[in-house]
Amino acid sequence: MNEHILTLARENAPCYLYEYDIMKAQVETLRQTFPQYDLLYSIKANPFPPVVRALAALGLGADAASAPEVLLSRKCGMAKEDIFFSAAGKSDAALEAAWDEGEIIADSLGEVARIGALCRRKGQRRAIGVRMNPAFGMGGGVGTSSKFGINEEDLPQLKALLDDLPVTVEGIHVHLKSQNLDADVLGGCYRDSWALAKRVQAALDCEMRYVNFGSGVGVAYDAAFEQPMNLAHLRTYTDAIAADNDATWKARLMIETGRFPTAQAGTYWLRVVDKKFSRGKAYVIAENCMNGLQKPALAAMLRHELGGGTPAPYEPLFTSEWAFPIIAHGDESRTETVDIVGNLCCAADVLAEDFTGPELAVGDLIEVRNAGAYACTLTAQRFSSHQPPRELLVYGDGRVETE
């Protein structure tokens, strides 16, 4: 364990610590895998401003899911041509806020019409991207109904709409499923999305300037249970697409990083505040369990509902039972089995059940790994009005950023 990290945890728990050097190494891995592609960081995975600034400085753009994420990306140093605002149900106010700050990806025919109306009010003509709901599914099969994107079969309607609006389409976005670890499944989705881009270009008679392949790059949370994505094999798909692009459109090719840069760069630290025994069961009570990191409590809830079975992933709320390894920083000369619970006024506030590890005492620390993505940002922190955990970005040279 890095002694500097441990010292920061002692001083700041409950807290999230994000390690810059791990983030940088993850980004370098993606750059080596996809040298001809631009990388877009999914801001929703971890919008902590120092993290976004660091990734912007490493050259990443943004997949922004709201107008505030667009504005955060700009504030953190990203160029507006590197920010792609793609979300269902954008309000007119959201479109206005993001209008001059990033690229807009329309999610529906209705949104295209509203963008056209805004263009007319502003006396402008605008190029946009469109998110597509393709006729294919992830891993094969046919497409399904979805709240996201414009159905591929609705391209004739989109063409008719565009013909009457001061709006042109210059790119597409496809996102079917995140946290996939099968290179053939994800690579096949990229291949099919490239073919879809050609169909969209032909149907709309437009210039295709960019293709965002979406769907993120999956993370193996625990090597004992999951095999990491075979990035070398995935590259065979992306290299083939890039070669075809070089011979034809020379469009901008983009891959969403998803949680890959940050998930394994973060740890969550809790402090033990009490310990008790109740009718044969030992409880360790720590500050800010469910209201600091919610996903383990959701995993316990699903496990109980299934009667002990293994729940299927339901991203981003539930990834797997082994997604967040727990390390007890206690007395290693003694072992105990306990339930680690929080200080909220509800029984669902659980970090781990029947956890066996070093004996913990009041004041000891508990570490939760893989807490750099869909962790702090996904947690309901205001329940019971406790102080929320701190967040810190930690550099290898000892520097720390908190805001």
Task: Name every feature range the model reports, one short phrase each.
Residues 1-120, 124-126, 164, 168, ...:
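A charged N-terminal "starter" segment
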Residues 23, 44, 66, 98, ...:
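Conserved, mostly hydrophobic/aromatic
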Residues 61, 84, 105, 129-131, ...:
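Structured core elements
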Residues 135-275, 384-386:
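Active-site loop/helix belt of alpha/beta enzymes
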Residues 2, 251-403:
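Charged (often Lys/Glu-rich) extended helix/loop segments that serve as interaction or gating elements
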Residues 45-47, 68, 89-91, 108-110, ...:
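Active-site-proximal loop/turn and secondary-structure-junction residues that shape catalytic pockets
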Residues 18-25, 46, 50, 110, ...:
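Conserved active-site and cofactor/substrate-binding residues in soluble primary-metabolism enzymes
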Residues 77-78, 96-98, 120-123, 140, ...:
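Solvent-exposed alpha-helices and their adjacent loops that cap or buttress functional pockets
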